[in-house]
Amino acid sequence: MKHTKKSHNGFTLIELIIVMVILGIMAAVAVPRYLDSISNAEEAAEDAVISSIRAGLTQYANNSLYSSGRAEWPTNPFDALSEKPAGYSTDATDADIDGEWTFSNSRITHQRADNSRFAWDYDEGTQGGGDDAKIGSLGPRTAIVQAQ
């Protein structure tokens, strides 16, 4: 009499648990890196817009100097751009929609997709040709703390 050995195909419970643990560890490492990459991408996009504004302000001041003899910056820094950034709004409040850029009360604001907001202080400077004239300034990025 010949005995045949039954073959059990499949995974044991231990093997399945080990796979789940490995997947959990991979997810714990990958998700924060993914979120960081999104934040870094949004920061890079903001930097590109602000660099564009700085270049536009320089061009605006040069054109003003050529035409009037005075280097002036516009009241609204977005007016120095030939093309406004995607999401630009003339809304008089701080940005409150994902991807929105606004300018009000001497402050440029941008809201990211994660609802965090950032601002850059803007000063157009003192206009005029006298000794009190000064060129404007565009400050660094600062986080806006939102009230809970």
Where are the language model's segments positioned?
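Extracellular/periplasmic head regions of type IV pilus-like filament subunits
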Residues: N62-F118
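Membrane-proximal N-terminal amphipathic helix
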Residues: S39-S67
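N-terminal leader/signal peptides at the extreme start of proteins
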Residues: M1-F11
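Short glycine/serine/threonine-biased micro-segments
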Residues: H8, I22-I25, R54
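Short, surface-exposed interaction loops/tails
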Residues: T109-Q148
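Alpha-helical hydrophobic helix detector
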Residues: I17-R33
